[in-house]
Amino acid sequence: MKLSRRSFMKANAVAAAAAAAGLSVPGVARAVVGQQEAIKWDKAPCRFCGTGCGVLVGTQQGRVVACQGDPDAPVNRGLNCIKGYFLPKIMYGKDRLTQPLLRMKNGKYDKEGEFTPITWDQAFDVMEEKFKTALKEKGPESIGMFGSGQWTIWEGYAASKLFKAGFRSNNIDPNARHCMASAVVGFMRTFGMDEPMGCYDDIEQADAFVLWGANMAEMHPILWSRITNRRLSNQNVTVAVLSTYQHRSFELADNGIIFTPQSDLVILNYIANYIIQNNAINQDFFSKHVNLRKGATDIGYGLRPTHPLEKAAKNPGSDASEPMSFEDYKAFVAEYTLEKTAEMTGVPKDQLEQLAQLYADPNKKVISYWTMGFNQHTRGVWANNLVYNLHLLTGKISQPGCGPFSLTGQPSACGTAREVGTFAHRLPADMVVTNEKHRDICEKKWNIPGGTIPAKIGLHAVAQDRALKDGKLNVYWTMCTNNMQAGPNINEERMPGWRDPRNFIIVSDPYPTVSALAADLILPTAMWVEKEGAYGNAERRTQFWRQQVQAPGEAKSDLWQLVQFSRRFKTEEVWPEELLAKKPELRGKTLYEVLYATPEVSKFPVSELAEDQLNDESRELGFYLQKGLFEEYAWFGRGHGHDLAPFDDYHKARGLRWPVVNGKETQWRYSEGNDPYVKAGEGYKFYGKPDGKAVIFALPFEPAAEAPDEEYDLWLSTGRVLEHWHTGSMTRRVPELHRAFPEAVLFIHPLDAKARDLRRGDKVKVVSRRGEVISIVETRGRNRPPQGLVYMPFFDAAQLVNKLTLDATDPLSKETDFKKCAVKLEKV
């Protein structure tokens, strides 16, 4: 039988999907499968961004040999982006780590020693000694962990239990602090619950898309393909793109807006003013479902307390707000006139009006999308709150085709970092450590003494760097992240602490990243389908996958590392006597027995796994660890608006969007007929708030922490490119992706280059007040900065752009502003 290439590809996809699901397939497809019968196919979510695409993974002889888009996956419908097609190759880089490595000299650990192979027992021996010494001498606040939005759900849950319940330290934070923390705080302030109310199904029903600091064409290309299809197939659909520089998403834009950095706050308030002045408020929705509050201002920049900007702030770090009347709110935004906004932002008046009209038109369904442009911002929480204002004023929310939508950058920044609660202040299901009732719920569920979980918020990501430098944090374990490259202000605030002899740094990673090479102990880690996992994507979709191959050498999953290390500690070594007296039956037990091998977690037998199903952790322990941890964790959200389905349902489905109630997922939250928590007759209910109403905040423009001046005369913005993911530790080991974009470049306006006697391809030294890097001048290509701004991606380990960035954060979310600092250029 002859097949065209198209037919072959289609049949192959259908056959693979059907085979993975155990279904019969048409004859043509069976013929194709017959040619590949040695390849076994199974489903998994993609390893990269927060879109949550479904892929089919092909394995053969113990290796991942193929990958294709899953045609049954509702997110991507069989399509992958360029990174997704090369997923198998991320696992087999030539420098893959396969055994623990410790800095040693003369046969023992030495901070200045060379990395030397050791066994896992030796690695845990050293870690045990370092942890116990720190806990005994300085207490729980001297240890910490930096985790990841790439952790599986049960890895994040296990880590949070180990630190918050076991070690009694809230000094655990995820790298999602650098990307999604502002979104979290924005959601909590406005709605009282985290995560978007809408879903990707909105795309096919929207009339307008507004991108606020989101280059979806490169960072969320599968979603962008759906938006492109919607725009090009309907002449009445509009796309507006806002950014501080021109990028690939502008190619589809009907209204491409370039604004002065930080002035997005001005535009947001102008649109609110326009809506009011043009009588475009949805009065029925507004009167029933919205409260108005005025937020504290002059809140600082999250820098060290000794920094002049922090000393000058009137209300540093204040999250306070007070009720206000509609007339007061109207007067507040009235200051943001068209003329003032055009002057402050540099955006032509006609473009501003066109943008405002999209929100004001009652007949247009509008989706607002944003990612790091909003979130990595010293007023990122405010930006999130202000975009919610526009949707709440107009009632364009929680309905098909309408709503604000915060896009995530990591595969489980939502499912793990946010929902599990691996932030220094959070517990599962939006609970927080500062709330006694929330701590009590967790302590009872975990069967640990009351008072075990500290009430004090732990160190967030940037504070961890500072504490390491100051010698206050002495044992530090990072997992599934490359913060030495990805975090801000490397020279001043991170490297000094990592290399301080007082501190011991552990890095768990599959590859020798910049972080790993700066550590004292490297633990080789299993990745992606070398373990059973679960991710939660940006639309609240929880997705599972099974282990499909084994990790190379002695590499172990983060879950295995956490659980096995917990065996090294008995309760008497980590808890004071007053806690042990409350539960004397826990004396003499290890943290493994107290946290993981409990009756509730260990009640699911390994026999639930198929005989040929890989699951290294569960088979070693003798019970289905992942299922036990998930079901215990899921209990916290069920009945509270975070309902997750039973564990087994996820292995059968292509993901389910929570809340999942009575077997039915939820596409749109907070609206009657869509959300099971909204009763008939309520219309809308923002049930995260006690009165069921969302909040509109009055928040002003405030300047960036650092701006160009006479000496440092250019804005620097950092970010990503299509071909590489974050620090490139996986994608740069894929030859095809590396060749496509082999090294970072400095995108610059041709006139700015000419004024500095620079030409395309020249080497250039980029200098800030904190450091310098050498890069390559690029005056063409995909990114076109305006005069006065340069853009540089952060994937290149040879060009550590975060030597330049400032560690200023949003004072409320503690998220770093990677988009705005001042630099100068010197020709090399």
Curated annotation (Swiss-Prot):
GO cellular component: membrane; nitrate reductase complex; periplasmic space
Reactions listed under catalytic activity: 2 Fe(II)-[cytochrome] + nitrate + 2 H(+) = 2 Fe(III)-[cytochrome] + nitrite + H2O
Compartment list: Periplasm
Oligomer status and interactors: Component of the periplasmic nitrate reductase NapAB complex composed of NapA and NapB.
InterPro entries cross-referenced by the UniProt entry: Asp_de-COase-like_dom_sf, CT_Nitrate-R-NapA-like, MoPterin_dinucl-bd_dom, Mopterin_OxRdtase, Mopterin_OxRdtase_4Fe-4S_dom, MopterinOxRdtase_cofactor_BS, Periplasm_NO3_reductase_lsu, Prok_molybdopt-oxidoreductase
Origin species: Escherichia coli (strain 55989 / EAEC)
Alphabetical GO biological process terms: cellular respiration; Mo-molybdopterin cofactor biosynthetic process; nitrate assimilation
Top class in the EC scheme: oxidoreductase
Name the UniProt record assigns to this protein: Periplasmic nitrate reductase
Protein residues bound to Mo-bis(molybdopterin guanine dinucleotide): 83, 150, 175, 179, 212-219, 243-247, 262-264, 372, 376, 482, 508-509, 531, 558, 718-727, 802, 819
